[in-house]
Amino acid sequence: MNFKIYETKIREEFELVLKWMHNEFIKLRTGRATPAILDGILVNYYGSMMPINQLANISVPEPRVLAIKPYDRSSIKDIATAINASNLGVNPQVDVDIIRLTFAAPTEEVRKNLVKKAKQVGEEAKIRVRHIRQEAQDLFKKDSTTIEDDKKFFQTELDNLTKELNKEIETVVSHKEKDIMTV
């Protein structure tokens, strides 16, 4: 069996791990407002649950402020209610046709907890990478058409890919830590 076939599949799975990690990092509040903070919040809109970004335009007029302008003004109270129920730690300020969310700067203790969470996400990503690596090793070992030299080559290449991805994970976690600790 050709290593390139395995390599392509492994790289795709590694990319999925990186995407997952980036999505988890977006959820960590660094003190700056980002529309992604609202991604998991669903609004009861005429009997169906819909994400806020499908009901409103979300912008960042200031670094710590989100402005939510509903497409339908009648949904403004439903959106504010959903935000209150989401435990974001902000109170929506409802104007006539816009909702403003002002995020306070996180305290030192909160930032340290966020750094811990970022490290946990990084460790979870590394665990996922190890599982992918183990599955690939098992799959390749079961391939009876492969000669022993190819198996050793595959193992070396797989180890290199894994080390490369783990370095990338560590770099991303390090950048996120710096981002969180910046006041």
From Swiss-Prot:
Recorded GO CC terms: cytoplasm
GO molecular function: ribosomal large subunit binding
Main location: cytoplasm
UniProt keyword annotations, A-Z: Cytoplasm, Protein biosynthesis
Superkingdom of origin: Bacteria
Record-linked InterPro entries: Ribosome_recyc_fac, Ribosome_recyc_fac_dom, RRF_sf
Annotated transmembrane regions: none
GO BP of this protein: translational termination
Localization of this protein: Cytoplasm
Entry-linked SUPFAM superfamilies: Ribosome recycling factor, RRF
Cited Gene3D superfamilies: 3.30.1360.40, Ribosome-recycling factor
Family according to the record: Belongs to the RRF family.
Role, per record: Responsible for the release of ribosomes from messenger RNA at the termination of protein biosynthesis. May increase the efficiency of translation by recycling ribosomes from one round of translation to another.
Name the UniProt record assigns to this protein: Ribosome-recycling factor
Name of the encoding gene: frr
